Amino acid sequence: MYDLSSKFNSFYTTHVVLPQSEQDNLHTKKNLNIQRLKDGLKEYNAENNTSYSIVETCVQGSVAMSTVVQNEDEDYDIDVAVVFDKSVLGDKGAQATRNLVANALKRKTKQFNTEPEVKTSCVRIKYADGYHIDFAVYRRHYDSTNECWIYEHAGSEWSERELRGLTDWFKLQNDDSDGDLRKIIRLSKMFCKSRTTWKNMPSGLLQTVLCNEKLQSTYERTDEQFYYTMQEIVNRLETSTSVAAPVDDGRDLTQRNIDHQRMTNWKNRLESKLEDLEVLFREDCTKDDAIQAWYGFFNHDYWGDQIIASESYSVNSVTKSVCRFFDGEQFIEELYPMQLLYHCDVSVSYTHLRAHET
């Protein structure tokens, strides 16, 4: 495979990894809206003579795993779990508890363009600049026998689920791969977001599980590891588009038809674009060929700029060569081989003058 690792690594560092300043911004928004929720609950309690409160919060998803990637549309997803005590909620159902969270948020987000949206698995608030925060709602009770907290997620109904299980699992897998897993997941997400026309692509969680399942850790170069991991994912999805969670007793992450359609879309689009990378394995592959191939795969301006820079370098090289050719005084013998032959006619006349004596 053509070694373009220097530029590939530069692409990853400068255009894939989310800058620390942006990561800090996400955490600031997270903290601000948790406080809004708490303040909204206090107001709700004062009006309704209740005592609901958030007893625990936990960042989940890509923010917790540090797999968020740069996004030109700034459509960043922040997942936050908010936990109530089961004893305080009483017999309040999953839907009713999500409605409670939405009510509390609505009181403190009146400046937003859209009201909090109650979804099946969370309550979402959207920022005008593209950010959105998903509040996953939980309740907990203490298991004195096993001396641990039991958490239940408010989905279509209450269901037992680990609060930090996925994040802990990911950190362990990433450490075992010396950080390579996080790199491959980020690159996979960049591919899935590479075309605005690509709808219904898999969630970050589904990509995370399959990237871990098929990670080709025998390759040292990131570009090779990414390529062969994606190839293995295509092969895997040819067999099955079902994915099970690595925690929560292997719950099905692809229960809906749309989930399977997203996995199929991923497979088809990956397969098509991987074919365009076959030029990287040709013996006559040039640097320009490799740049063009990765540009076609990621559809990112970074690679387009590399093509322009390469073409500009070629033109400048020719110009400099021409300039050097005419730089300074030029002699004909520097251009053509020469053999000089001389023919001379010499005529000598001699006159002897005798001096006169005096």
What do the PLM-derived regions correspond to, one by one?
Residues 1-75, 87-96:
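N-terminal regions immediately upstream of nucleotidyltransferase
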